UniProtKB/Swiss-Prot annotation:
Top EC class, one word: transferase
Keywords: Pyridoxal phosphate, Transferase
Knockout mutant characteristics: Produces fewer spikelets with blight symptoms on susceptible wheat cultivars.
InterPro entries: Aminotrans_V_dom (IPR000192), PyrdxlP-dep_Trfase (IPR015424), PyrdxlP-dep_Trfase_major (IPR015421), PyrdxlP-dep_Trfase_small (IPR015422)
Protein name listed in UniProt: Aminotransferase-like protein FGM3
Induction: Expression is positively regulated by the cluster-specific transcription factor FGM4 and is induced during infection of coleoptiles of wheat seedlings. The fusaoctaxin A gene cluster is silenced by H3K27 trimethylation by the histone methyltransferase KMT6.
Protein's job: Aminotransferase-like protein; part of the Fg3_54/C64 gene cluster that mediates the biosynthesis of the octapeptide fusaoctaxin A, a virulence factor that is required for cell-to-cell invasiveness of plant host. The 2 nonribosomal peptide synthetases NRPS9 and NRPS5 form an assembly line which likely utilizes GABA as a starter unit (loaded on the unique module M1 of NRPS9) and sequentially incorporates seven extender units composed of the residues L-Ala, L-allo-Ile, L-Ser, L-Val, L-Ser, L-Leu and L-Leu, respectively.
GO MF annotation terms: transferase activity
């Protein structure tokens, strides 16, 4: 994609699935895949399986080719987030890489872990599990404003002690769409010597560039299948933070990189190499490309949120500001007098919109903070290949069913 100008027509032409009449409004659950990653004739995934599907690391020609492709994919992934190649690991999902990370962290009895119930469960349950096994203590960082929950770094400071070992939080809620200030949070966490910050970037990564060095997080994870690629994930771990991890690998294997410590051969070779065309999509100047994406997405969320807040029977959760600096176009709401399930089913009955209802694995947020049942919220989650016209069609459908 050219970073000099944003053409929605050009963007949409690169996603074969968009040829359908379906309006994809459930992108926070998984985005559509670039044609360069999964084109119909000979995708790079298929090419890998046909031409170089052998074990890595051998000396014969096909293995050296396969190893080079795999290594180049790792290099592309590391460059994409401004990390060293020895600071990343590819996994099956963000849930899986966080569980591996929690298993590897050398927890001691009395260590304190600070979690937030704003998060997706993937960045909560692993820490609860291994804290219990190691007699560590859990503290909860709960937002003070339950109507518009945000993670306040100053509130976090009051929870920190010299026993704090790790803070886990989300960069952006997969329900609220609110962007949290990770750099400010990291600065507060690192006031405690040795304390670590683990960030779930899954709901943020489809919308903005990621620079892990600028953010200052010790660990950062996201899923490529929500960033226009195949169903794999990435975990970053700084070299300094890796010193606090044990290796999950076999005793005779090296443990000098995050991949050595945590991969457990879980990186699908054929899917991993698809990272190369995926990252190339953002062009030679990715920052400009992402800036253009943010501008377009602001138009989408402005149209949708302005409509929703104009309806007295609708409650929007999270930021009602349409400013791209504070939120992404993942928008959740409920309708007075209607279940979220019935709203979604009614919208789908009168339109081509694909949206969703529920708690989206952020059950603690939906139940404990928002005070909702498992029926949860209606979520419309948009990305840069959606159009203003599609948003208008969703609005028309909502008008018909409210």
């Amino acid at each position: 994609m050219s970073s000099s100008s944003f053409s929605i027509e050009n963007v949409r032409s690169q996603f074969p699935a968009l040829e359908k009449r379906q309006i994809f409004g459930d992108n926070a659950g998984g985005s559509q895949v670039l044609g360069t990653v999964a084109k119909r004739q000979l995708s790079p995934i298929t090419e890998y399986l046909i031409e170089t599907n052998v074990q890595l690391g051998a000396s014969y020609k096909t293995s050296t080719q396969s190893t080079a492709i795999f290594d180049n994919a790792y290099k592309a992934a590391a460059k994409y987030i401004n990390a060293g190649i020895d600071e990343i690991v590819i996994g099956a999902s963000t849930t899986q890489v966080f569980r591996n990370l929690a298993a590897a962290l050398k927890l001691q009895p009395g260590d304190e872990l600070i979690l937030t119930n704003v998060d997706h469960e993937s960045n909560i349950d692993p820490w609860l599990h291994y804290a219990a096994l190691n007699n560590a203590t859990i503290k909860w960082w709960t937002p003070s404003d339950l109507n518009n929950p945000k993670l306040d770094p100053e509130q976090l400071r009051s929870l920190l002690t010299n026993k704090t070992r790790l803070v886990a939080c989300t960069h952006c809620s997969n329900i609220l769409g609110t962007i949290n200030n990770i750099k400010a949070i990291a600065d507060v966490v690192h006031e405690i010597p040795g304390a670590l910050l683990a960030v779930d970037g899954v709901a943020y990564a489809p919308h903005r560039a990621i620079d892990v060095k600028e953010l200052g997080a010790d660990f950062y994870a996201f899923s490529w299948y929500k960033v226009y690629g195949p169903h794999i994930s990435l975990l970053y771990g700084s070299k300094a933070a890796q010193a606090q991890l044990s290796s999950l690998g076999h005793f005779f294997n090296p443990d000098g990189s995050l991949m050595d410590k945590l991969e457990l051969a879980a990186a699908s070779y054929e899917l991993t190499q698809a990272i190369i065309p995926l990252t190339a999509y953002f062009g030679e100047n990715p920052k400009q490309t992402w800036d253009a994406i943010a501008e377009h997405e602001q138009k989408l969320q402005t149209r949708l949120i302005e409509y929703l807040v104009s309806k007295p029977q609708i409650t929007v959760y999270g930021e009602t500001s349409t400013d791209k600096a504070v939120r992404v176009p993942t928008v959740s709401f409920t309708v007075e007098g209607m279940s979220s399930q019935s709203v979604v089913e009614a919208v789908e009955a009168v339109s081509h919109a694909g949206i969703r209802w529920g708690h989206f694995f952020s059950k603690r947020l939906v139940g404990s903070i928002l005070g909702l049942s498992d029926d949860g919220v209606v979520r419309v989650s948009l990305v840069h290949y959606n159009t203003v016209e599609e948003v208008d069609q969703i609005i028309v459908a909502l008008e018909m069913v409210l």
